[in-house]
Amino acid sequence: ASLQAGPEAGYRPVTPRLEDAFIALLGGGPGGDSTLAALMPDHHSTLQQGPVIEAQGLTKRFGDFTATDQVSFTVQRGEIFGLLGPNGAGKSTTFKMECGLLRPSAGQAKVMGYSLSKSPGKARQQLGYMAQKFSLYGNLSVEQNLRFFSGVYGLRGRAQNEKIARMSDAFGLKSIARHAADELPLGYKQRLALACSLMHEPDILFLDEPTSGVDPLTRREFWLHINSMVD
């Protein structure tokens, strides 16, 4: 199934929802600019021209069951691109193939021009992945999770310590640095998971249902961070 581009982005009035009324009662929720934008490098001049994410006929079979069937789409630089569908539609499976966590039964996945099958190391270095269940190590502290994920991508010594400090400030994690990840409320787990996925300053960020189960204020704060990073 080839995904076609949607209409041009724009604004139109909509009927307020219950969540909107709730946010208004709390003073309007988070606003302004995210501090995260100042911490992330400007990739505008280094990103390649053309699609930065490509799915070409991606198919995944588990025995006799076909989870995805000939999925094709492209994502351009600066786009926030989403996959919509019911549970079991194959969204997470598609994400995992694009991140190199699952090998396709057929088709090809590319990130920044690198094939996940031919150059998996180079492709993975370009991307960050925030999984649906956050993929944190529950028995490790907040700081230890940040140190582990940054270390996986080669950050060491002073550079690593400085990045941990900056991310902890940006996401409000300093006061809970020694708390185990399993002890955190869902909203803080979300903040930590996003921070971990950004430690190596990736060009591309994959988010698998990142706001599922969190409260409206936390959800809006999350998208404030995401929108601040768009070129």
Where in this protein do the model-derived segments appear?
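N-terminal accessory interaction module
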Residues: 1-2
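ABC-family P-loop ATPase nucleotide-binding domain
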Residues: 6-10, 14-60
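ABC transporter nucleotide-binding domains
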Residues: 53-231
